[in-house]
UniProtKB/Swiss-Prot annotation:
The name this protein goes by in its record: Uncharacterized protein ORF4
Record's compositionally biased regions (Basic and acidic residues): 54-67
UniProt region (Disordered), positions on chain: 53-82
Length: 179
């Protein structure tokens, strides 16, 4: 499995370089920076996801006075360009990257640095990652963290190519807009 130097790849000045591994099976995320080999010599994509960053206050920007009234003749604020990537949090020894899929913003993905596992055939995984939820017989379950795992790690999975059955610290996909 390949490692990505976050400091170099993402170029966030405020983040110390951290080694991490992410494998995405969802098919909706941006193109990979590196390619890794999974079980059965299946080529998987290791991706860095998009996520909008919260706006930062600009100390040099003029602030509105208390007496100013909404709707007064004033220039509308210029939207600030958002950084392409959001900083990575480190929770204990688990590096977490939170993302919003650029093609379908309702999809929010949360990946942790853990080994990827392929538990379906490639054709089934490909169908699962591109088809919407169609009421499969085995409804996906909500996984709960094992004792000792951080409660902050989102363990929900909803029948995508990553699917239920992974340990809580493996790849996780939250596709609530399919339900």
């Amino acid at each position: 499995m390949a490692s990505i130097d976050v400091g170099e790849t993402i170029g966030i000045e405020q983040v110390e370089p951290v080694k991490f591994r992410f494998v995405c099976h969802c098919g909706f995320c941006p193109p990979s920076f590196v390619t890794a080999r999974g079980a059965g010599s299946v080529s998987l994509r290791v991706v860095v996801h998009y996520v909008p960053s919260p706006e930062r206050e600009d100390p040099e920007s003029p602030t509105r006075g208390v007496d100013e009234v909404d709707g007064a003749c004033s220039e509308p604020p210029t939207p600030r360009p958002e950084p392409r990537f959001r900083a990575i949090e480190e929770m204990g020894k688990i590096v977490v990257l939170v993302s919003v899929c650029p093609l379908r913003p309702a999809l929010q993905h949360r990946w942790v640095g853990a080994p990827a596992r392929r538990h379906r055939s490639d054709s089934v995984a490909r169908r699962a990652r591109f088809e919407p939820w169609r009421g499969r017989a085995s409804r996906p379950t909500v996984l709960t963290p094992a004792s000792g795992d951080s409660d902050d790690v989102d363990t929900r999975t909803f029948g995508c190519g990553c699917g239920p059955g992974h340990p809580p610290v493996d790849c996780m996909c939250d596709r609530q807009d399919w339900l």
